[in-house]
A protein has these predicted regions:
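C-terminal helical cap(s) of enzyme catalytic domains, especially alpha/beta-barrels
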Residues: 103-108, 205, 218-236
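Catalytic cores of alpha/beta
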Residues: 28, 76-85, 169, 190-210, ...
Length: 236
């Protein structure tokens, strides 16, 4: 099955390599072939050779890499960590969207091609979850919008948010030329898993999202390549 979709569409799909180790991740990437050009490596994979996998996918296979670390620490530590990670030529890197964290990350990424994405509120959380964590009262969409605005003002190249909040974020003046990247995307009919604020690939694109992140619906599929191609078809 040949991928006849344009590269501009293929790059909108980021597949999360949430598999046990780098070898499994590489095998999956080889199975997906030209159907996927962008991969997310999260904290779980980092302990299983994730940075080595990132380097191999970049250098040997020409793929783009989204390193999902959600860094959160004092400014000096974040800046140093980001500066060290830029040696891997990462395309996207996540930090928590707090202004001091974003600002430090941007300083650490200076002179590199790494784009810093600020996390607003995890797509696996709803208002009840926020209440348990003693997060301030208010509609969750309003909180996401507030955090997105603060992240943009601190210099973030983009934000992580659910596709449900994407239209409001896109309408922010600060969002001009910034990226909106959304987990919480599930193909029509797919199980939600641990996601709560979700949309289909087609809905996400219609809502102004730049990139969608999909994991289990691809790598748990009997035919991962066909699953990825079906998602691209939904997005087209």
């Amino acid at each position: 099955m040949t991928n006849n979709h344009p590269a501009t569409l293929t790059e909108k799909l980021i597949v999360a390599l949430d598999v046990p180790n780098a070898l499994d991740g590489l095998k999956l990437a080889e199975t997906l072939g030209d159907a996927v050009s962008f991969y997310k490596i999260g904290l779980g994979m980092l302990t299983g050779g994730g940075l080595a996998l990132a380097a191999e996918l970049k250098d040997e296979h020409g793929k783009k890499i989204f390193l999902d670390m959600k860094l959160f620490d004092i400014g000096a530590t974040v800046e140093a960590a980001v500066r060290g990670l830029t040696q891997f030529d990462i395309d996207f890197l996540t930090v928590h969207g707090d202004p001091h964290v974003v600002n430090a990350a941007k300083q650490g990424a200076a002179g590199s091609n790494t784009k810093i994405l600020g996390v607003t509120i995890l797509t696996s959380l709803d208002r009840q979850d926020l209440d348990k964590c003693l997060i301030k009262d208010g509609d969750i969409q309003d909180l996401v919008l507030e955090r997105a605005g603060l992240a943009f003002e601190a210099g973030a190249d983009g934000v992580i948010a659910s596709p449900q909040e994407a239209p409001m974020i896109r309408a922010l003046p600060q969002a001009k030329d910034r990226l909106i990247v959304t987990p919480g995307v599930r193909p029509a009919g797919a199980a939600l898993g641990d996601q709560k604020r979700v949309a289909t690939p087609a809905q996400a694109v219609a809502n102004g999202v730049d990139h969608i992140v999909v994991g289990r619906p691809v790598w748990q599929a009997a035919d991962p390549r066909a699953a990825a191609m079906a998602i691209l078809d939904e997005m087209a």
